[in-house]
Amino acid sequence: MSERRYSPLATLFAATFLFRIGNAVAALALPWFVLSHTKSAAWAGATAASSVIATIIGAWVGGGLVDRFGRAPVALISGVVGGVAMASIPLLDAVGALSNTGLIACVVLGAAFDAPGMAAQDSELPKLGHVAGLSVERVSSLKAVIGNVASLGGPALGGAAIGLLGAAPTLGLTAFCSVLAGLLGAWVLPARAARTMTTTATLSMRAGVAFLWSEPLLRPLFGIVMIFVGIVGANGSVIMPALFVDAGRQVAELGLFSSMMGAGGLLGIAIHASVGARISAQNWLAVAFCGSAVGSLLLSQLPGVPVLMLLGALVGLLTGSVSPILNAAIYNRTPPELLGRVLGTVSAVMLSASPM
């Protein structure tokens, strides 16, 4: 009985992990391959920018595809198409048929199908969590733990794979992860949509935006978290590196600081998964926002390495629970027939927040 209740959620989490670890490995292997193939930083930058734009567009429209065609078909197609796109890169390169524009086309195709696949998986989490006897808050936190573990372990795994096999075969491994994630998703997810959709307008982002705007809790919560995520993302990718460079600090210190923040975030999510249901979301967010503000103020002084690492872990710990809290609120307050579009809208806006 216990296995029947937990196995669907475990299968979906396995698909999520494969998807995330594949993307984390590709985030290292793909730039390495592009630079080796094109010998141009400009082409590497163009490839990265094209990938981000394709991912955001895929997030905008992907939720509507999930709600219209069903979760299993979208998960399967996203995984297979993304895998084929990644596998095409080393295969075309092996036969000497990979041009720079063809390389970008493969990357864009794979990136565009990332978000629909994740929306298909995430839309079913509340139901499978209920079957497993877990609260929405705990399921949301467990999913975040899986994503963070993949994000932390992916670069190390990617570096080892590139060192042993090379960048091209490593991209083949990411393709395998994508296809397997799609197959697992198709196996455990429902094939039919939550409700039949008859108009193409509902495929757009408008339905998701309209619902978020009209929902009295989600509207302010989403706005606050979006700003917070944008600031935290800018801190990690722009502000802290700039401070380190201006102060003449070592790049190894920056790398260790980033790792400590990631480890702290993982611990924060794990704590929220364990005791989050006992504490109100309002109190969690108040502690996260105020604590991270104080931590960021102290970080701006660039203290010695031990204190710097401790502050990095502390800020990560405090901010780790923010995303699971938002996701849990979305799961609790969004009708099933709208969940794909709402998740797609949230994903697209969050992806846009940090670059802006």
Positions of predicted regions on the chain:
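Juxtamembrane helix-start elements in MFS-like secondary transporters
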Residues: 40-48, 103, 136, 250-258
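Transmembrane alpha-helix termini and helix-breaking/packing motifs in multi-pass membrane transporters
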Residues: 31-37, 89-95, 153-173, 245-247, ...
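Juxtamembrane intracellular "pre-TM" segments in multi-pass secondary transporters
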Residues: 1-10, 190-223
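A generic transmembrane-helix signature of 12-TM secondary carrier transporters
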Residues: 79, 83-86, 92, 106-107, ...
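A single, central transmembrane helix in multi-pass transporters
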Residues: 29, 165-172, 210-269
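C-terminal transmembrane bundle of multi-pass solute transporters/carriers
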Residues: 57-61, 68, 72-77, 88, ...
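Substrate-agnostic recognition of the 12-TM MFS/MFS-like secondary transporter fold
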Residues: 11-27, 51-64, 70-82, 102-160, ...
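Hydrophobic alpha-helical transmembrane segments
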Residues: 100-111, 138-194, 201, 255, ...
